[in-house]
């Protein structure tokens, strides 16, 4: 009559029955809560699987779009070739005898009659050849029908050469990875079944469904990776190899639409030292760069005629940037695409859709911007339960106990460990390319700092207890002023003592007095280079009386700031069309300039002459720093190398090779450590003698500038992801993080370590006060 699970009535005197105790009720509530928690966890896992599946489907869509676009181009190309050959034949035929003319005309007509049977036979033969090639390379292939759906393809226009080759390549790629994919699926299915058998709270049907979804996601993932590699190879034919480092441009992403564009050679800076195509003969361009406020994937145009912002097809690079439909917390999404007539070498233009193939699709966060400037100490109360956070994010925990203890001692909140801008919905994706076992530490806190040993072994860094405490370590930074420069700010520097800030944009440097709160206009403007050329670097001599400016021109301008009105004291002319970075020796006698041709020019400032050139970089030299004692120089280049130079002997000392272009670097004033900012979004901290290094993973896109504090205990980096990150030297504990509204291209720290200035793509510089 009553349900079996009905709770017993309270015990009354004189009646036999169970004793009512609070402990039993609490246990029952606890059991029910654990059951609900397990159900919630399984639903969360299923939701994550579906989200991953959706991501992979979107990538597949992009991949097929890219493939169809490529085939369409190839078809038009082959059609045009056929028309031209026809014209040539028609012109040559009259020179033949009458008899030969008829034979040739008949042969031409026969050649035009390609039937579907012949076409299918040709495709079948190509697939057979692909199978033989696959057999020779990867062992016996898995049989594959001529068409992915098992049907014969519909009529295709008769094409020759590389178009049919592309079809064969597709068939080969599909067959080559099927066997590997199936084997991996079996392993993963077994693993999921073993996992589900140990989970009492999930029903068998749920386990089976989860394993099926897991296998489907693995299929998508393997296929997407393989197809990305195939597309990169097959589409590279559309690119020429002529792109070199002097073709670097700046994209003013926030420029008013009504403003007429200047010559294509002076397009504004896009983030990440992107190289431009076809601009070599027009003008030097340069490596810093600027992005849109919504961090849309940058684009590269093949044709200068398509240099319009809103219509340029193309793609940026392998750097992960958020999709336009998923704005980062605290930023406003700007409609429209930001075009960028530049690219790093080896990137292939096929359409803006292609960039999503190389771009993780992020989900929006529900956490707003105010978290951006909170210190980690203030954030530690958020979601401190390790099991709650691990359950929420389905995070694997295979880290060492030492790392766990260190993380607990460090006390970094889960939210801040992704940057104080909200949760990352897929923590293991945060550290790009890392195995899932390295993506988090016990307790569900994602790792972002890793120690890389000499043999390449990567381990999360256990932070010491004083990682965020102690003398000279800031707690956070607060924004105190905004300097509206009016153009993209590619270079900033602060005077010593801290009073003036110099901001370099298009064709001029503006001087601001930050000692007066609320100052909204510059006190002076230094017009240099050409009006449309961007300034890439400006450096003050230690006495504060001389400013050296370099950028998209072959000349460096030396300004005398001590005169009643600043004036040009001298100009230094080099053979390179652009200067990307400057450094001044501690004794202020020598200036070093990074040239777009890869050379490092050494200038005697007293005699205003070129005294030496360091040659070694095979592509543009993009960044530079000098040791505190003035004996060693460090340079980074677009040739993926960092080199050190002995200034006394004038020779190269060391060379570090990377897999990514180098956009920024800084040498610790106290010696030993060199921090390097990559196009791949990593920051790497190298020891000047030991092979060990640290790898830091909080940026989501190109790391565009980097600067050490003068005490050497911390440094800051800025990126295309709109972030300013402050790191502990050398292991990279995140001290604080600030989110700006656009790409942050440049930064500087005052000599007393009390102020930070950044220059960004939304035409302003921002002054921060460092709070200790």
UniProtKB/Swiss-Prot annotation:
Record-linked SUPFAM superfamilies: WD40 repeat-like (SSF50978)
Domains as described in the record: WD repeat Groucho/TLE family members are characterized by 5 regions, a glutamine-rich Q domain, a glycine/proline-rich GP domain, a central CcN domain, containing a nuclear localization signal, and a serine/proline-rich SP domain. The most highly conserved are the N-terminal Q domain and the C-terminal WD-repeat domain.
Family to which this protein belongs: Belongs to the WD repeat Groucho/TLE family.
Each WD repeat, start to end: 484-522, 530-569, 574-613, 616-655, 657-696, 698-737, 739-771
Gene3D superfamilies from the UniProt entry: YVTN repeat-like/Quinoprotein amine dehydrogenase
Swiss-Prot/TrEMBL induction comment: Repressed during TNFSF11/RANKL-induced osteoclast differentiation.
Region Disordered, annotated ranges: 130-163, 184-347
Composition skew (Low complexity), residue ranges: 197-207, 284-299
Bias (Basic and acidic residues): 184-196, 209-247, 272-283, 300-309
Tissue and organ distribution: Expressed only in testis. Expressed in bone marrow-derived macrophages.
Organism: Mus musculus
PANTHER family assigned: TRANSDUCIN-LIKE ENHANCER PROTEIN, TRANSDUCIN-LIKE ENHANCER PROTEIN 3
Residue positions, PTM Phosphothreonine: 259, 312, 319, 321, 328, 334
Sequence segments annotated as region (CcN domain): 200-268
Protein localization: Nucleus
Biased composition (Polar residues): 310-322
Biological role: Transcriptional corepressor that binds to a number of transcription factors. Inhibits the transcriptional activation mediated by CTNNB1 and TCF family members in Wnt signaling. The effects of full-length TLE family members may be modulated by association with dominant-negative AES.
Segments for region (Q domain): 1-131
Cross-link Glycyl lysine isopeptide (Lys-Gly) (interchain with G-Cter in ubiquitin) placement: 720
Protein name: Transducin-like enhancer protein 3
Keyword Phosphoprotein included in the entry's annotation: yes
UniProt keyword list: Acetylation, Developmental protein, Differentiation, Isopeptide bond, Nucleus, Phosphoprotein, Repeat, Repressor, Spermatogenesis, Transcription, Transcription regulation, Ubl conjugation, WD repeat, Wnt signaling pathway
PTM field: Ubiquitinated by XIAP/BIRC4. This ubiquitination does not affect its stability, nuclear localization, or capacity to tetramerize but inhibits its interaction with TCF7L2/TCF4. Ubiquitinated at Lys-720 by UBR5 in response to Wnt signaling, leading to substrate recognition by the segregase p97/VCP and degradation by the proteasome.
SMART domains the UniProt entry points to: WD40
